[in-house]
Amino acid sequence: MTLERDAAAQVAKVLSEALPYIRRFVGKTLVIKYGGNAMESEELKQGFARDIVLMKAVGINPVVVHGGGPQIGDLLKRLSIESHFIDGMRVTDTATMDVVEMVLGGQVNKSIVNLINQHGGSAIGLTGKDAGLIRAKKLKVTRQTPEMTQPEIIDIGHVGEVTGVNTELLNMLVQGDFIPVIAPIGVGPDGESYNINADLVAGKVAEALKAEKLMLLTNIAGLLDKQGEVLTGLTTEQVDGLIADGTIYGGMLPKIRCALEAVQGGVHSAHIVDGRVPNAVLLEIFTDSGVGTLITNRKRH
């Protein structure tokens, strides 16, 4: 009985701590980029789906943007299509783009939608091609060495960048109590498909919706200082300083720049969240301690 009471008391404590956050975020939109380990572990997948459904149940509006790089790589390998990367971006020729659309728009998207719906949500799967949801153009990549007088233009195929977001469609779905689940495939002016980094799509969607929060699930504990300790709260100015002094570097740079752009573009805060932690989304939103790094714009306070 004592153990049961202790467990009940812990639940009550958690709910009590969550209440002010729930009140604060009722009616607000949160854009969550879902990827990494959180998409691979069955326990974490189930927990993510429950978190999303609970958010909607208490009046918060989640919009999910998902990745799927490992799943794309697996199918390309099975089809004997070689993968090439330049600056961390997948070179996407026509054959690869077909696979990207099959995996992201089909297999991955529908599995996430199905999981959320199994837990009582009303999720709808979309790609950026649906109603021109994610408008895009070809990403221009250049490279220059000291020996070159002019930068070299590198063609990485159907890789794009976001030029616009159909917020009317997303707002209609959110107001209808649906949970949009977006595959990061954009559509060009002539109907061509583009493979776009999911972090970038999530950031642009959050910015276009003027979302309360952008949450990027990762496979790390958050932004780390040079001693390896998690930096729990930063302003955009502090993040700029950490980039300048080399604390933030390598593969984290594109993710952090995406978060910075979103906050500077009107999103109230961006979060780098440890997706390896069960119920990471709820812990970051509804508890005092959180499970990652919060980035805000000083000018908004």
Curated annotation (Swiss-Prot):
Query: Where, by residue number, does substrate bind?
Result: G68, G69, R90, N195
Q: Does the keyword Cytoplasm apply?
A: yes
Site note Transition state stabilizer applies to K33, K255
The cellular component terms of Gene Ontology attached to this UniProt record, alphabetical and capped at eight, are: cytoplasm
Q: Name one GO biological process term.
A: L-arginine biosynthetic process
Cross-referenced CDD domains: AAK_NAGK-C
Q: Which reaction does it catalyse?
A: N-acetyl-L-glutamate + ATP = N-acetyl-L-glutamyl 5-phosphate + ADP
Pathway involvement?
Amino-acid biosynthesis; L-arginine biosynthesis; N(2)-acetyl-L-ornithine from L-glutamate: step 2/4
Keyword annotations for this protein, in alphabetical order, are:
Amino-acid biosynthesis, Arginine biosynthesis, ATP-binding, Cytoplasm, Kinase, Nucleotide-binding, Transferase
Its EC number(s): 2.7.2.8
Which family is it part of?
A: Belongs to the acetylglutamate kinase family. ArgB subfamily.
- Physiological role: Catalyzes the ATP-dependent phosphorylation of N-acetyl-L-glutamate.
Name of protein: Acetylglutamate kinase
Give the source species: Ectopseudomonas mendocina (strain ymp)
